[in-house]
């Protein structure tokens, strides 16, 4: 279960990196948003069967998806300083998500 939840987040981050920095077309932006929504939906359904304490994993992943979408917006506006700060925040949020997933599941 831990591997599954961590792998989904890593795949989302890879797709987001490609759509934000490498392939700047509308189609990849739409796919990134759809994948983020589906990731949140799958994680919400997965954590429904666990105690309330495990909802922290969902909240942290929600913050990660929101941060990635803000990064995409900042990259669209060519704010490189903001993008660098948001990339560091995304890395920090992913580390927190990783630790919570290992500890709670």
From Swiss-Prot:
Superkingdom of source: Bacteria
Keywords of this entry: Membrane, Transmembrane, Transmembrane helix
Its membrane topology: Multi-pass membrane protein
Compartments in which it is found: Membrane
Cytoplasmic side: 22-29, 77-84
Disruption phenotype: Decreases cytolytic toxin production, including alpha-hemolysin Hla and phenol-soluble modulin (PSM) toxins, perhaps as a result of repression or lack of activation of the major regulator of toxin expression, the accessory gene regulatory (Agr) quorum sensing system. Reduces abundance of staphyloxanthin in bacterial membranes. Significantly more sensitive to treatment with detergent, sodium dodecyl sulfate (SDS) and more susceptible to penetration by the DNA-staining dye propidium iodide.
Keyword match S-adenosyl-L-methionine: no
Protein's name in the database: Membrane-stabilizing protein A
Gene it is expressed from: mspA
């Amino acid at each position: 279960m831990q591997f599954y939840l961590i792998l989904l987040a890593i795949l989302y981050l890879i797709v987001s990196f490609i759509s934000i920095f490498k392939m700047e077309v509308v189609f990849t932006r739409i796919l990134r948003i759809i994948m983020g929504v589906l990731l949140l939906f799958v994680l919400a359904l997965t954590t429904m069967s666990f105690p309330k304490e495990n909802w922290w994993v969902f909240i942290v992943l929600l913050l990660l998806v929101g941060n990635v979408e803000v990064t995409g917006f900042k990259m669209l506006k060519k704010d490189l300083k903001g993008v660098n700060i948001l990339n560091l925040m995304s890395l920090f949020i992913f580390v927190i998500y990783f630790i919570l997933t290992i500890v709670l599941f």
